[in-house]
A protein has these predicted regions:
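Membrane-embedded transmembrane alpha-helical bundles that form the catalytic cores
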Residues: 1-265
């Protein structure tokens, strides 16, 4: 219920699109299990297309002139149709949960797991609130056992979760945001850095980027831990990598799973 309330509070109408996406995925996954290979692929493509269409239409096609040039009167204020869509229709975390449910569909299609028979579990997987803001993008086989196991109030989990959140806030607010001031000064539009200044700027930017992303993920993981639900670690000290491939694996460990989409044939 907390996840539904979170999505509803962020966008009342947006909750409808979350439910619509989860219904498409739930029905498609069940159907994929029951049909032959040719029909499986058609159902997969149609369901993926439906989910992506909702995402692309609300987030990107709303920028077309047909939406930006038309105004509506909302609560006494005149707003462009594009502004109405962005403010009232787009669900929070739409890009994240769309990629997440597509990974679930692909796992069912490839036979890596059985389709979930309980719709409410699919819906909760779609809109579990801590990861909607910044990820991480989780596979159903990894997140479902954490979501649907029996949960009890555990002060150890709460203590660990709060510590993780404080560590995340420290990295994001006291390191990333502070270093960002110097990075902006070095790479200001009217300034072209050279030599040592440019190298210092690049190093500072790398630290800022890492602390910003990893700090945000730590806050999310910490909030989830308070409920006894563990989320996968998304950053594993990438700057200690010995190769570019290892750097990529350590930098965004969950995003590499979404790269499987590129291998679909």
């Amino acid at each position: 219920m907390l996840s539904f309330a979170f999505v509803y509070a962020a966008s009342m109408i947006g909750l409808f699109f979350v439910v619509l996406t989860s219904v498409i995925v739930y029905l498609a996954a069940k159907k994929i299990e029951k049909v032959d290979d040719d029909r499986k692929k058609k159902i997969l493509l149609l369901s993926m297309g439906g989910c992506l269409f909702i995402l692309i239409f609300l987030k990107y096609l709303s920028g077309l002139p047909i939406f930006t040039d038309r105004n509506l009167l909302i609560f006494g204020n005149e707003m462009s149709l594009q502004s109405v869509i962005k403010k009232y229709l787009i669900p929070i975390g739409m890009s994240y949960y769309t990629l997440q449910v597509i990974s679930y569909l692909l796992d069912v299609y490839w036979g890596r797991m059985e389709a979930e028979q309980d719709y409410w579990k699919v819906l909760l997987f779609t809109c579990y609130f801590p990861q909607l803001v910044q990820g991480p993008i989780s596979k159903y086989s990894e997140l479902a056992p954490e979501l649907f196991k029996e949960h009890k109030l555990d002060w150890k989990n709460i203590k660990y979760g709060v510590q993780l959140m404080f560590w995340g806030f420290f990295k994001k607010m006291l390191i990333a945001d502070r270093i960002g001031i110097y990075v902006n000064a070095i790479f200001h539009d009217s300034v072209t850095p050279y030599g040592l200044t440019a190298w210092i700027g690049l190093v500072f930017y790398g630290i800022q980027l890492y602390c910003d992303f990893s700090g945000g993920i730590d806050v999310i993981r910490g909030a989830s831990e308070c409920f006894g639900i563990g989320l996968k670690e998304n950053f594993r000290q990438p700057y200690f990598s010995l190769s570019l491939g290892e750097f990529w694996r350590r930098w965004h460990t969950q995003r590499k799973q979404i790269g499987l989409l590129k291998n679909f044939k």
